Amino acid sequence: MNRTILHSDCNCFYASVELLHHPELRGKPVAVGGDPEARHGIVLTADYTAKRYGVKTGMALWQAKQVCPDITFLPPRMDLYLRFSRMAQEIYADYTDKREPYGIDESWLDVTDSATLKGDGFHIAQEISSRMKKELGITVSVGVSFNKIFAKLGSDYKKPDAITTMYEDEFQRKAWCLPVSDLLYVGNATNKKLYSMGIRTIGDLAKSDETLLVRKLGKMGSILWAFANGYDESPVKLENTSAPVKSVGNSTTTPRDMETDEDVKIVLYILAESVAARLRENGFRCRTVEISVRDKELFHFSKQVKLQNASNITKEIAEAGYRLYKDNYRLPADDKELKSSRTEFFQKPLRSIGIRGTDFVTDYFWEQLDIFMDPQAREKQMKMDETVDIIRKRFGFYSVQRGLMYRDRILSACDAKSDHTVHPHGYFG
């Protein structure tokens, strides 16, 4: 049975939401990105007026000011954006329960079974687009296709406020002429390798020798070749699908790149809080902690460590993850030798990071504690975590925060446990 997959992308999401609250700025260049005097201030999102001046996501605020002197900067309000994201999901839920968020502002929808009641994919996309404007005041670009890859490509094809089809009988005509970098999972590093092989377009990739691609790119070569040729059977995950719990983890792509060890520590603690809380909810402790790291060039690795004692304590899980990071990665900003070196350094600022606990035992599992561990201090940490759980359940996630989180409100503005979405580039889970 042929599938009908939509990919809905909220246009300039942060900026669009802010303009609803600042109507006086409509038609003027606006960017969301914090304090322009801040050391790490970057553009998180620019509206289309600012983009016409050359302002781009990820650009330093001072650079944005140079190319667009009249730009207005607004500080990010992640709680507001998450609320709008949830309202968008409520609209999508009227059409299907097969919804897979891809970050805060994008989602795949499998509407195959909705055709009888709601009409074909293009008609559903029109309805969703209309409702988003009327009910939320924002626009979306929607791709309509027979798989997730080309649905995503369709939503990127034309912006803003557009619907693009990439059906099975037209994807070669529409997609193959596009730059290969437009294909999901082709980052800068992969694009450079493909360019060195003479591959410029998605069509070039589709017509390439799969064996040669595997030789140059490993298994990713075969995956990208399949994507370019329209071979993607990956399902849109059913909402609230549950399976036997074998691991508990969270990952995120941060609003700006992580450039220092402290940046990484903040994000790891946020994610570890979610992992530990979910372990406690399910009555588990983990004996192994694993981290996954991806830098701005999309190079990635995973490392794991066995804990001395099984744990669902936030601090123990976070510190185990942080030690793994410190033992296996150095950021340029924290490397004194690198600062004085003129050579290219292999490791770059980080784009995303994840942490998970595996190898479970139940809360009732007995084990002998390490003789060097202070049982009273550990008991204190357990009680503190349990108290935080109770407070947050009653008054909300932001009712109690670690002091560490106040060092960078952009990086820390995330409720990983409640949000719990798949973030780019988390396509393969």
Question: At which residue positions do the language-model features occur?
Answer:
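Non-catalytic surface loops within mature trypsin-like serine protease
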Residues: G34, D113, F146, D295, ...
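DNA-contacting surface of Y-family translesion DNA polymerases
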Residues: H7, D182, T190-Q347
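Acidic, metal-coordinating catalytic segment for phosphate/diphosphate chemistry
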Residues: N309-G429
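A short glycine-rich, hydrophobically flanked beta-strand micro-motif that places a catalytic Asp/Glu
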Residues: V140, V144, R287-E290, I353
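Short, charged/polar surface micro-motifs in flexible loops or helix N-caps
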Residues: F13, P36-R39, K296-F299, F360-D363
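Gly/Gly-Pro- and Ser/Thr-rich, intrinsically disordered tail segments characteristic of DNA damage-repair
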Residues: M1-N229, V236-E239, A277, P375-G429
